[in-house]
Amino acid sequence: MSVVVRHDWDRKELQALFDLPFPELLHRAASVHRAHFDPAQVQVSTLLSVKTGGCPEDCAYCPQAQRYDTGVSAQKLMETEEVVAKARQAKAAGASRFCMGAAWRSPKERDIPKVAAMIREVKAMGLETCATLGMLDAGQARALKDAGLDYYNHNLDTAPDYYDSIIHTRQYQDRLNTLEHVRDVGLKTCCGGIVGMGETREHRVGLLLALATLPAHPDSVPINQLVQVPGTPLHGTQQLDPFEFVRMIAVARIAMPKSMVRLSAGREAMSDELQALCFLAGANSIFYGEKLLTTGNPDTERDQALFQRLGLRPMQITVDAAEHDHPGTVHAEITRSAACEHAA
């Protein structure tokens, strides 16, 4: 099956995909997925909060916003040695990518060298590296790239016409500007959004339209299901229909056929059957480990058991650290399945 990568999608086309009968939509999405990926392989990442809480922004979904009483206290930036220890544990559990998140509006200049040191050390272990630190300027993006960062995550969160219902302290254009800085220095982009925040299907179409018409499709597209945290404004929002979540995955796969589509936040509350439908619809990446920043995530044993039941295996990668300013050269290939790592 030949699939053309397009950047000229229009709203009517994506809306028509969303409105297809569910079996037909899954068939189309699975066909596109198979044209570009091995459907039995899933990329496995681990996400660590290296700086938790105290964020000055007002994102209505976020327990790390200091203005909400969520029980999350502000903590200082972790030491590099602590981060390396967590990365070592993640690799032993089968992760191939290690993501570092900090609850900042944007990093201060004094923080960039500290994060760069974390990136260099994790990269030298043979892991892909990803960071999500808030808004970046061009110089900060360059510094992270020079440290060896592979991916930068900066989500659009929701559709442009629903954005003001969720966030007031950062403009949509601010997010687009950060993505531009990241692309300009050659970093891979990780960009998606959150569903289940009270938006309509039309808003979900709008989010995917914004993503699929970027100058370059994100290399990774995380689709998050809202995790409702007491104390945040969105706590108590009506739950999204699980089939609607699968539709979101399927249309993302069709619209961005070469991107990794990641099951991100909210997976802890998903049944194995729902996750299996998401993999069938084209999801091929998950976060692995008991926490996503400050919210829960399925434990590794559950994920390993699910992979075994579905016949899935972690995606193999090769990380070359020689292209960066590291002492020595690292060629690492993650080849053992998570189940084997657990058995060992």
Swiss-Prot record:
Class of the enzyme per the UniProt entry, highest EC level: transferase
Domain Radical SAM core: 40-267
GO biological process: biotin biosynthetic process
Binding residues for [2Fe-2S] cluster: 99, 130, 190, 262
Cofactor: [4Fe-4S] cluster; [2Fe-2S] cluster
This protein's pathway: Cofactor biosynthesis; biotin biosynthesis; biotin from 7,8-diaminononanoate: step 2/2
Domain of life: Bacteria
Enzyme nomenclature, EC number: 2.8.1.6
TM segment ranges: none
GO MF entry, a single one: iron ion binding
Cofactor note: Binds 1 [4Fe-4S] cluster. The cluster is coordinated with 3 cysteines and an exchangeable S-adenosyl-L-methionine. Binds 1 [2Fe-2S] cluster. The cluster is coordinated with 3 cysteines and 1 arginine.
Gene3D superfamilies: Aldolase class I
Sorted UniProt keywords: 2Fe-2S, 4Fe-4S, Biotin biosynthesis, Iron, Iron-sulfur, Metal-binding, S-adenosyl-L-methionine, Transferase
The reaction(s) this protein catalyses: (4R,5S)-dethiobiotin + (sulfur carrier)-SH + 2 reduced [2Fe-2S]-[ferredoxin] + 2 S-adenosyl-L-methionine = (sulfur carrier)-H + biotin + 2 5'-deoxyadenosine + 2 L-methionine + 2 oxidized [2Fe-2S]-[ferredoxin]
Keyword S-adenosyl-L-methionine attributed: yes
Known function: Catalyzes the conversion of dethiobiotin (DTB) to biotin by the insertion of a sulfur atom into dethiobiotin via a radical-based mechanism.
Family classification: Belongs to the radical SAM superfamily. Biotin synthase family.
Quaternary assembly: Homodimer.
Protein name: Biotin synthase
